[in-house]
């Protein structure tokens, strides 16, 4: 009798790639208008959702905030990559959007070491896949 091969579990790096992609898609959907246009929060440029990027206030290397919706906003490539997201303007934007104490807390917590477990990455993938589906239902 032939052996039945078990499905391989995805590697951690594959889960991170998938979570990044799905979360980024959600952020761009969340921050676009009903015509699929995103307004960059730093320079106010209007760009198509598909060309927008997911800008992290606290960098993605900080796992605690990598998938935190309050840390991420859709914006243009110029501000995110070329200008390296202009930290001063982004900080002011964050302080206006939330409050100074919240921004200070995020900055202070960003120094803490936090590693997401495999099941947490799977939960993130499932959560934001569902949120994307809800947006799709609302816009169709």
Description of each model-found segment:
Residues 48, 72-99:
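Short Cys/His-centered divalent metal-binding micro-motifs
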Residues 60-72, 95-108:
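Short microdomains enriched in Cys/His and/or Lys/Arg
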Residues 1-26, 31, 46-47, 106-140:
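A boundary/linker detector
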Residues 15, 64, 82:
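Conserved aromatic-histidine-acidic binding/catalytic patches
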Residues 39-71:
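Histidine-centered nuclease catalytic patch
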Residues 20-23, 30-39, 68-72:
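Short metal-coordination and nucleic-acid-contact micro-motifs, chiefly zinc-binding Cys/His arrays
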Residues 7-12, 57-60, 76:
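Short, flexible active-site loops
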């Amino acid at each position: 009798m032939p052996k039945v091969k078990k499905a391989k579990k995805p590697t951690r790096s594959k889960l991170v790639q998938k979570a990044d992609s799905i979360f980024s898609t959600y952020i761009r959907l969340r921050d676009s208008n009903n015509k699929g246009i995103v307004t960059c929060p730093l320079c106010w440029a209007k760009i198509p959702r598909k060309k927008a990027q997911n800008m992290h206030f606290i960098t993605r290397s900080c796992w605690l905030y990598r998938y935190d919706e309050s840390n991420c906003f859709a914006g243009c490539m110029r501000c995110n990559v070329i200008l390296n997201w202009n930290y001063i303007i982004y900080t002011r934007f964050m302080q206006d959007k939330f409050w100074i104490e919240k921004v200070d807390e995020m900055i202070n917590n960003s120094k803490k070491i936090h590693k997401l477990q495999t099941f947490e990455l799977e939960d993130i993938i499932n959560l934001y896949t569902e949120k994307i589906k809800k947006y799709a239902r609302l816009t169709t």
